């Protein structure tokens, strides 16, 4: 991994004169494989994600972690999650092991500080770095993303309305979390349009609790179910994430950054 990070740093440094490409990584939380139209849904509507798939690359054979927290540990460290000690969500003390046949290995709930993050590597290569959303790798002290390579970082998870943020950030009453995070992401892009930037936008959606904007739920209220896809509220949550993708894409187009991102 150290060699890989070194090569990454060298590559971006060597081509700095050519303006290194911007990098945006958008993550949806607990989104099912077939919960977007491009992967089979005929009930949920994801036109912006579908457009990205049509213009880019779809991964149809790949390794992924079993749930949320190890996925994030692997993404940030560039290592298999098991190498970071993050095997599952939370500590093993959250389960009653007397009711389970197997006890897993001890699990850490924060990405160890000796793991170099992709944000730290890109920052060394001259990138502006921003993260807005669900971090889930530790928020206290040096574990907060602002201490792990991100120039700007706002963490939020737990609720889609009346949410809290770390650090505390003011927002209009009734604002939906996905819209709030997207607004911060768009602002970050606009302020860093003249330099290479790395934007990490990990949405809390579509994780429970199931909370959606009423106007989006109304779109799906009378739509006929297709197989197991039938919940207007969940559909509206997916639509909010898709809207976020659309807003980010539109911002790149407006700033003429799409071809270098």
Segments (PLM) and residue ranges:
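Formylglycine-dependent sulfatase
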Residues: 2, 16-261
């Amino acid at each position: 991994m150290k060699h890989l990070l070194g090569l990454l740093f060298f590559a971006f440094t060597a081509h700095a004169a050519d303006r290194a490409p911007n990098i945006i990584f958008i993550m949806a939380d607990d989104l099912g494989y077939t919960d977007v139209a491009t992967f089979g849904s005929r009930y949920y509507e994801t036109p912006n994600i579908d457009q990205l798939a049509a213009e880019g690359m779809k991964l149809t054979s790949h390794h992924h972690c079993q749930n949320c927290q190890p996925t994030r540990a692997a993404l940030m460290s560039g290592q298999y999650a098991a190498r970071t000690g993050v095997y599952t969500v939370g500590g093993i003390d959250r389960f009653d092991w007397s009711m389970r046949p197997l006890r897993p290995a001890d699990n850490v709930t924060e990405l160890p500080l000796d793991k170099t993050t992709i944000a730290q590597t890109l920052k060394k290569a001259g990138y502006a770095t921003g993260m807005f959303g669900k971090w889930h790798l530790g928020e206290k002290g040096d574990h907060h993303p602002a201490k792990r390579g991100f120039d700007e970082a706002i963490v939020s998870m737990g609720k889609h309305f009346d949410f809290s943020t770390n650090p505390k950030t003011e927002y209009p009453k009734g604002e939906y979390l996905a819209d709030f995070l997207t607004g911060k992401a768009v602002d970050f892009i606009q302020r860093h349009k003249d330099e290479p930037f790395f934007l990490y936008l990990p949405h809390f959606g579509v994780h429970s609790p199931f909370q959606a904007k009423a106007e989006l739920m109304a779109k799906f209220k009378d739509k006929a179910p297709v197989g197991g896809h039938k919940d207007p509220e969940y559909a509206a949550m997916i639509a909010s994430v898709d809207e976020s993708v659309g807003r980010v894409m539109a911002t790149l187009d407006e700033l003429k950054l799409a071809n270098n991102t």
